[in-house]
From Swiss-Prot:
<dbReference type="InterPro" id="IPR001370">
    <property type="entry name" value="BIR_rpt"/>
</dbReference>
<dbReference type="Pfam" id="PF13920">
    <property type="entry name" value="zf-C3HC4_3"/>
</dbReference>
<feature type="binding site">
    <location>
        <position position="168"/>
    </location>
    <ligand>
        <name>Zn(2+)</name>
    </ligand>
</feature>
<dbReference type="GO" id="GO:0008270">
    <property type="term" value="F:zinc ion binding"/>
</dbReference>
<dbReference type="InterPro" id="IPR001841">
    <property type="entry name" value="Znf_RING"/>
</dbReference>
<dbReference type="GO" id="GO:0043066">
    <property type="term" value="P:negative regulation of apoptotic process"/>
</dbReference>
<keyword id="KW-0833">Ubl conjugation pathway</keyword>
<feature type="zinc finger region" description="RING-type">
    <location>
        <begin position="221"/>
        <end position="256"/>
    </location>
</feature>
<dbReference type="GO" id="GO:0031398">
    <property type="term" value="P:positive regulation of protein ubiquitination"/>
</dbReference>
<keyword id="KW-0863">Zinc-finger</keyword>
<keyword id="KW-0053">Apoptosis</keyword>
<comment type="function">
    <text>RING-finger E3 ubiquitin ligase required to prevent cellular apoptosis in infected cells. Ubiquitinates and subsequently targets host pro-apoptotic cellular proteins such as HID for degradation by the proteasome.</text>
</comment>
<keyword id="KW-0832">Ubl conjugation</keyword>
<dbReference type="InterPro" id="IPR013083">
    <property type="entry name" value="Znf_RING/FYVE/PHD"/>
</dbReference>
<dbReference type="GO" id="GO:0043027">
    <property type="term" value="F:cysteine-type endopeptidase inhibitor activity involved in apoptotic process"/>
</dbReference>
<keyword id="KW-1130">Modulation of host ubiquitin pathway by virus</keyword>
<dbReference type="GO" id="GO:0061630">
    <property type="term" value="F:ubiquitin protein ligase activity"/>
</dbReference>
Length: 268
């Protein structure tokens, strides 16, 4: 019979039950955070160190310090968690990105304009200008410093394994361009993965091949004719563009009406 750390969640236990979560804190080592408070915030104890996991979104948080608030940290790292959203009394409409504001650098609103800034991009870096421009970045001309045309967020000191979209979402999770093109679920996933503690020596790197599916013609973006239509223009209501193309227009290409905002659509 295999041993199990006292207080660790039992196999098959329903951790969505508060009492079950509370029962995992038998050997909880953090004296300044009450187990009842942790359980009430959706977390159960994993039985190692001070690592906890949400029973609903699976985000894992560790390295708690005095002054930390489990509910606040839960909302910060996993804003789309269903448990967090229910506690906050969010409505389904909150899934839509905020009303579109003016881009910080409108001259770089198109991918082509951003790509042109990478003429002197350092050749030794793994990140290609094409993928950086696609992720919303333009090159500042200094070292490896890049900046988002929309949120004005800057990134530098790129590591070989840094993926532009993931880094953009991780450090600037409220960027309207990221939310419009990639969606809140992508941002949620990136933020969750960023705060999950992994043992680099024991956990293999898993690459999931990208799956490209042909999109029916009637679902294609009418601007680039390559990606799927995912954005609804407000107030006209036309659905004709993908996130990347929508970020670069201020009038609807169908009715030529002025746009108040562009909202990413979700399949339910």
């Amino acid at each position: 019979m295999s041993s199990r750390a006292i207080g660790a969640p039992q196999e098959g236990a329903d951790m969505k039950n508060k009492a079950a979560r509370l029962g995992t804190y038998t050997n909880w080592p953090v004296q300044f955070l009450e187990p009842s408070r942790m359980a009430a915030s959706g977390f159960y104890y994993l039985g190692r160190g001070d690592e906890v996991r949400c029973a609903f979104c699976k985000v894992e948080i560790t390295n708690w310090v005095r002054g930390d608030d489990p509910e606040t940290d839960h909302k910060r790292w996993a804003p789309q968690c269903p448990f967090v959203r229910n506690n906050a009394h969010d409505t389904p409409h909150d899934r839509a990105p905020p009303a579109r504001s003016a881009a910080a650098h409108p001259q770089y609103a198109t991918e082509a304009a951003r790509l042109r800034t990478f003429a002197e991009w350092p050749r030794g870096l793994k990140q290609r200008p094409e993928e950086l421009a696609e992720a919303g970045f333009f090159y500042t001309g200094q070292g490896d410093k890049t900046r988002c045309f929309c949120c004005d967020g800057g990134l530098k000191d790129w590591e070989p394994d840094d993926a532009p979209w993931q880094q953009h979402a991780r450090w600037y999770d409220r960027c309207e361009y990221v939310l419009l093109v990639k969606g809140r679920d992508f941002v949620q996933r990136v933020m969750t993965e960023a705060c999950v503690v992994r043992d680099a020596d024991n956990e293999p790197h898993i690459e999931r091949p990208a799956v490209e599916a042909e999109v029916a013609d009637d679902r294609l973006c009418k601007i680039c004719l390559g990606a799927e239509k995912t954005v609804c223009f407000v107030p006209c209501g036309h659905v004709v563009a993908c996130g990347k193309c929508a970020a670069g227009v201020t009038t609807c290409p169908v009715c030529r009406g002025q746009l108040d905002k562009a909202v990413r659509m979700y399949q339910v």
